[in-house]
């Protein structure tokens, strides 16, 4: 997994949902509107004097391409609708994404889901994200293949990935979009109580898809990630959302970028992890600091297992049998361990977001959904 700190503030999923419903009266209406180009900004809106957008036509509709001010990966770009309209996932979404990678075959392009909790941080303006970066998800192999009746020109299968993902491939963008729309239609109304999947409760829809498009070996490819945003008393931020035991690392929505395997983590972790490493090396109680107390149980669960012994480091052995008078080798080992353990937490967070778990019950549930497509 890839780890990145982020420069944007950490957001509560409930605040994101509320922002998506709020009526906008300011100018520009949101941070993605085309009116941001060259805008000087004001007290509550960032300046965008150097901002430029490039017009595109996707499936007959007007869009604009811009490069993101928050560069999470190589050539990170945003493809925004000319109009300030809400995010939506439908057949048109698939056609537009495929049209984009047809025009830019060296780029990946995807869309956040159109529902709170499983969507991104901006639900109020229709947009996609793309770029020239190979995400870990691209390398995920097929786990099994299946057939979609009437879509003989489309290769279909599920891939080995923490989130439940169907991969479709075809030389025909039209055939691929139609097959994807069939999967979306089936998923929108799908229930499986055994896997706690309900498409609707109290009049609220829960099932949607995070789609990702790319060109590979001369074929169009679509990854369809099955999402569900149901909440419970035990999990008020989302049942298929990072569970509370991981919130000290990742509490926000699992959006498009995370779905593809790149961890977008809160900026606070930089200082928190630096202090955590210092306190571990000095033998100080992690629970005595505001910055590290939330990480105490987590750190204590792996320090001994990784053979990290601060006392040995201060005595000059570094815990590895060699001279380490300043403890620099131990510090380096500890820093590497922290990075690896954050990656493990991120993988667990992705597993939380998977609707069909990697258990016997989860795999049987995935098979039942595939059967519903036949």
Indicate residue ranges for each PLM-predicted region:
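Intrinsically disordered, low-complexity linker/loop segments enriched in Gly/Pro
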Residues: 82-104
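C-terminal accessory/tail domains of diverse enzymes
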Residues: 157-374
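Histidine-centered divalent-metal-coordination microenvironment in nucleic-acid enzymes
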Residues: 76, 81, 118-135, 225
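Beta-rich nucleic-acid/ligand-interaction surfaces
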Residues: 116-124, 201-208
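Residues forming anionic-ligand binding surfaces in small-molecule and nucleic-acid pockets
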Residues: 68-83, 158-162
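Catalytic or ion-translocation cores adjacent to nucleophile or general acid/base/metal-coordination motifs
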Residues: 92, 101-121, 130-191
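SsDNA-processing nucleotidyl-transfer enzymes
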Residues: 17, 23-76
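Short, small-residue-biased leader/transition segments that mark boundaries at the very start
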Residues: 1-3
